[in-house]
Amino acid sequence: MNASVPPSAAEYGGDEVSAIVLDPGFSTTRAGFAGEDTPKSLVPTYYGKYSFEGQEKLIFGDDVFVTPRPSLSVGNPMGRDGVVEDWDMAEKLWEYSFTSRLTGAKPSNPLHNGLNDLVEGELPTEMEGVETNEKPLADSPLLMSECSWNPTKAREKTIEIAMEKWGTPAFYLARNGVLASFAAGKASALVVDIGASNISVTPVHDGMVLKRGVQHSPLGGDYISSQIRALFKTNTPQPITITPHYLISSKTAVEAGQPPQAKYKTFPPEKAPDASYRSLLEERTLTEFKECVVQVWPGPTKLSAPGPNGVPNEEMARSTPGRPFEFPDGYNQVFGVDRYRVVESLFDAKATILDPDSQFPAPTPAQTIPELIKAALNGVDVDLRPHLLANVVVTGASSLLYGFTDRLNQELMQLYPGPRVRISAPGNTSERRFSSWIGGSILASLGTFHQMWISKKEFDEHGPNIVEKRCK
């Protein structure tokens, strides 16, 4: 299929076309073929940069985490608000996500047949000899996801990369909220998405985002990690320092609460990776901690409030069995009421664990999940509200915290005692983590979707602004 001649509409309908679905997030980027259940390619949205023999080299994929190279620094092309900040890196990283697992490398592919290390000077900046080099998506229509507040400039830049750099014959840009509601089998829903860098609440009606109701705040999974760090600083019997695996050569088992007995590796300054590498590796331990230990207080009242029988909730929490966790250096401890504290501020801003060193400012009440939902519903027509409350879709990897949906249900029933509140949150972890991707996979494989694609011909005629008219 030649990239300059768009296929006929029939070739877009359903299975004849191997459309690719690309769902970039702050923590991971998901890519796969339309019609499949889960994305084949899941790569970190982080890249590594280091110098070798005087040349700058780049690393993508899981290799970023594996080897602590000298002066290796780690970056992320996405901003915390979900909008791309570094377009050059975003383009390379997205291209890696589908060429490494899905399409294979084409002759002009800058990733040199999937090998990670690139020499900056060798990357084709102009696409010289476009006719002789096949572009990476010359045979595949591309559906991409975006946040609901993505600005026009970013949307236009995305279609330019897809059409001009990758040579896709057809393109569509879909909003995350709409895709997540399709994945849940709903045309209308209130989508609560707890991602790594932010929380968003998106009202969707008949497959369209109700823009006035869209709300988002920076209290995502990375904010919870910062709350865990703040907790560790004030921990008793001793403050906890996270030492990533690459700095430990051996460890000895110790009793709970006893100082660790480990032998540490040291790197001379010229061989040591950058601080950004260490903090990314610490984040992996924090993610494990969130998965194994952290729990959301089930409610119905806040953790700081008295419970239904007059006993303070914190006392109730203390009486529940704790959860043990072992750190990479062998230090281990059982966590009691503290495991509830680190997420309580998603629902109650006053419960924030303050940390002067945190990159996150203390949240305001308006940034908490109940208030975001309230603001989202206040932004839409009164008649739609009961229908949206009966179709609340919970998605995003950070929504997998133990007890999260129970607490959300309690909060919503208190805010809206009249209408029926129904929460749809798939128990299957991959459905919850990849729901935008799954929605895109469903959408791009529908036969009726073929009239929605923007063809290369239309892009050439109307320019990048066509994305604003066609992808509402």
UniProtKB/Swiss-Prot annotation:
Protein's name according to its UniProt entry: Actin-related protein 4
Q: Which domain of life is it from?
A: Eukaryota
Q: Enumerate the subcellular locations listed in this protein's record, separating them with semicolons.
A: Nucleus
Q: Which family does it belong to?
A: Belongs to the actin family. ARP4 subfamily.
Q: How does it assemble?
A: Component of the NuA4 histone acetyltransferase complex, of the INO80 chromatin remodeling complex, and of the SWR1 chromatin remodeling complex.
Encoding gene (name): arp4
Family matches, as Pfam families: Actin
Q: Does the keyword Magnesium apply?
A: no
Instruction: List, alphabetically, the InterPro entries matched.
Output: Actin, ATPase_NBD
